[in-house]
UniProtKB/Swiss-Prot annotation:
Organism: Bacillus subtilis (strain 168)
Pfam families tied to this protein: M20_dimer (PF07687), Peptidase_M20 (PF01546)
Alphabetical keyword list: Aminopeptidase, Cytoplasm, Hydrolase, Metal-binding, Metalloprotease, Protease, Zinc
InterPro entries named in the record: ArgE/DapE_CS (IPR001261), Bact_exopeptidase_dim_dom (IPR036264), Peptidase_M20 (IPR002933), Peptidase_M20_dimer (IPR011650), Peptidase_M20B (IPR010161)
Purpose of the protein: Cleaves the N-terminal amino acid of tripeptides.
Name under which the protein is recorded: Peptidase T
Annotated EC: 3.4.11.4
Reaction catalysed by this enzyme: Release of the N-terminal residue from a tripeptide
Predominant cellular place of this UniProt entry's protein: cytoplasm
Active site: D81, E176 (proton acceptor)
């Protein structure tokens, strides 16, 4: 199974599928359609039914039930796009057999080294087969590892008809990394009672809580005048932007928070004297705290509007997704089945909140409760991203075991 997974995964990551928030089309980039069409062909070749891609880049397929029991239809999902944080073009995966626990030189010329000194969890992978980057791109394990694992699990179930299961639906979605993954997802057509995203990190991750999330875009309009004659006339929008940021709690940023703590994150700032634009994301697990954070942002803007004028500072704030716990707790048995599946395989479930979001965050509010399970990847979204093939095999086994458990408990 290891060779199958390596072959699939290394093929997928070589297709540039980085999404693009500045584009309104779905999918936002053509590479996502390229990979989607490849996946449809592969789904058909392994024997999946109804494999197709729609005009928006959503791939769906079915593995029919092979049991006489009345088993709920379950789904497994992964996303085809990679993050905007770091380039995903010309990915050149490196395979490290039987990792020795020492530094891994990713790129000698650029002096890029993946070291246990910087990433202590790396030491725990001694003896594993690892796949890394070449130090110039991200890897794309988020979320092409999930695609490879779902594909391999379906292939395994088809080749082992003695394993009884209900109907299984599979979907590969576009534009998850820019928050649009489920926007055009047809829940009715998918027709599953429950689903799992295979979009987590290290071995054993099982998540059914996500942030409540909002984005805030602020435009500040200044007044540029020659600095030699600027007294009483110039309004420096960049300085107002600095002032705005100072009105937010300095210690409530991603670099200072963990666990259930929320934050304000200044994603980008672009500007000059005449105009400055700030892009924040706001995150919190607790609904009331989430509302309070948005109010804090509004008050900061209003304070500056009162000082500089209503029309000089414009706030565009909108909710992105909500904590899926509220929709999953009423059907907590789907989390318990995944937990049991891991325990049956000798894997310790690590149930923790996602300090982020998945497609499941939105899908759960669209009527498809969708917790998240691990892929085996580490250090997503950058050149130090890597994944254990050994743990990818375990993710495949968990998918198969979840299918078995739903049938056994029906």
């Amino acid at each position: 199974m290891k060779e199958e997974i390596i072959e699939r995964f290394t093929t997928y990551v070589k297709v540039d599928t980085q999404s693009d928030e500045s584009v309104d089309t779905c999918p936002s980039t053509p590479g996502q359609l390229t990979l989607g069409n490849m996946l449809v062909d592969e789904l058909k070749s392994i024997g999946m039914q109804d494999a197709a891609i729609d005009e928006n880049g959503y791939v769906m397929a079915t593995l029919p039930s092979n049991t006489e029991k009345d088993v709920p239809t379950i789904g497994f999902l992964a996303h085809v796009d990679t993050a905007t944080d770091f380039t995903g073009k010309n990915v050149n995966p490196q395979i490290i057999e039987s990792y020795d626990g020492k530094d891994i030189v990713l790129n000698e010329q650029l002096q890029v080294t993946l070291s246990p000194d910087q990433f202590p969890e790396l030491s725990g992978y001694k003896g594993h087969t690892l796949i890394t980057t070449d130090g110039t791109t991200l890897l794309g394990a988020d979320n092409k590892a999930g695609i490879a694992e779902i594909m391999t699990a379906m292939d395994y179930l088809i080749k082992h008809p003695e394993i009884k299961h209900g109907t299984i639906r599979v979907a590969f979605t576009p534009d998850e990394e820019i928050g649009r993954g489920p926007h055009k997802f047809d829940v009715k057509r998918f027709n599953a009672s429950f689903a799992y995203t295979v979009d987590g990190g290290p071995l054993g991750e099982l998540e059914y809580e996500s942030f409540n999330a909002a984005a805030a875009k602020i435009t500040i309009k200044g007044n540029n005048v020659h600095p030699g004659t600027a007294k009483g006339k110039m309004i420096n929008s960049a300085k107002i932007a600095m002032k705005l940021n100072s009105l937010l709690p300095a210690d409530e940023a991603p670099e200072y928070t963990e666990g259930y703590e929320g934050f304000y994150h200044l994603l980008s700032i672009q500007g000059d004297v005449e105009e400055t634009k700030l892009h924040y994301i706001i995150r919190d697990f607790d609904k009331e705290n989430f509302q309070n954070r948005k109010e804090t942002m509004k008050r900061a803007v209003e304070e500056l509007q009162n000082e500089y004028g209503q029309d000089r500072i414009l706030l565009d704030m909108n909710d992105q997704y909500y904590n899926m716990r509220e929709k999953i707790e009423p059907v907590i048995e789907i989390v318990n089945i995944a937990k049991q599946a891991m325990e049956n395989l000798g894997i310790e479930p690590k149930i923790s909140p996602i300090r982020g979001g998945t497609d499941g965050s939105q899908l759960s509010y669209m009527g498809l409760p969708t917790p998240n399970i691990f892929t085996g990847g580490e250090n997503f979204h950058g050149k130090f991203e890597y994944i254990s093939v050994d743990n990818m095999v375990k993710a495949v086994n968990v998918i198969v075991e979840i299918a078995k458990q739903f049938e056994a408990q029906a």
